[in-house]
UniProtKB/Swiss-Prot annotation:
GO annotation, cellular component aspect: cytosol
Name listed for the protein in its UniProt record: Glucokinase
Pfam families: Glucokinase (PF02685)
Domain of life: Bacteria
Organism listed in the record: Edwardsiella ictaluri (strain 93-146)
Assigned keywords, A-Z: ATP-binding, Cytoplasm, Glycolysis, Kinase, Nucleotide-binding, Transferase
GO molecular function, one term: glucokinase activity
Record has ATP-binding as a keyword: yes
Known catalytic reactions: D-glucose + ATP = D-glucose 6-phosphate + ADP + H(+)
Gene3D superfamilies: 3.30.420.40, 3.40.367.20
Compartments (UniProt record): Cytoplasm
Amino acid sequence: MSRFALVGDVGGTNARLALCCLDTGSLEAVQSYPGQQFDSLESVIRTYLQAQAVSVTSACIAIACPITGDRVAMTNHSWAFSISAMQRSLGLAHLSVINDFTAVSMAVPVLPAESLLQLGGQTVQPDRPIAIYGAGTGLGVAHLIRAGERWISLPGEGGHVDFATGSDEEDALLAALRTDLGRVSAERVLSGPGLVNLYRAVARVAGRTPQPLTPQEVSERALADHCPDCRRALSLFCVMMGRFGGNLALNMGTFGGVYIAGGIVPRFLAFFRDSGFRQAFEDKGRFKAYLAPIPVFLIVHDNPGLLGAGAYLRQHLGARL
């Protein structure tokens, strides 16, 4: 009989939970819960487990914040907890809590080919470093390397590096952003809230008053071509995603590929493919030829975080991915 474990992918907005088959890595009973409706992550987990007919003794939860010890406090949510205390309370023999992009990175080796859409470059070079990043509520970043028969994720907080401009227009936008935000990190432009920040900066630099729009409204008006400032903001978002991805590729020579996750880009996929993304990715002066063969993939799997949390746990328990 197959053994199951609990896996989770917890972001600033929703908590997704599923059962992972430890034999095959497949996911079952995927459920999503609005985080604001629960006072703790443990209460979400209990609600989910009570609805399942399977008992679990192991779990891996991916969460959108730095994991530096036993105490976890989310970056974009009020939830905070002790890993060891929650493990005892839930009666689990094993509980791993990992960064959300550690999970996404661990999904890469097990993603089916149909879950990847290539955006330029050539073929993946086996056993070379991999970069993963993605815009959602925030900007997540991780790298992945192969060490013998194991995959090792190298998480970090790369979304909070300084935002780097690449044109006079972007210099002007950075000045406008700095007026509102002080220090401007990459996440301040490459995220859902970041798209709104970009729109507001574009409007202000043009001498117009920005409207109070949501990220979805900015992208919808851009795609409908009903708002020049929204459309310019979305175009710049794509370019900046390319430039940021190129920086990641340079950092570690990621000839194993660069993978884009997150819930934002798939909403305007055709626009993204036709944008200046790939040109900006390769626009590194003397190192353009170095970056040109590196493939970029958009992850179109519905739940890469859950898949990766399962892969992380299975490898930890001795499986070979």
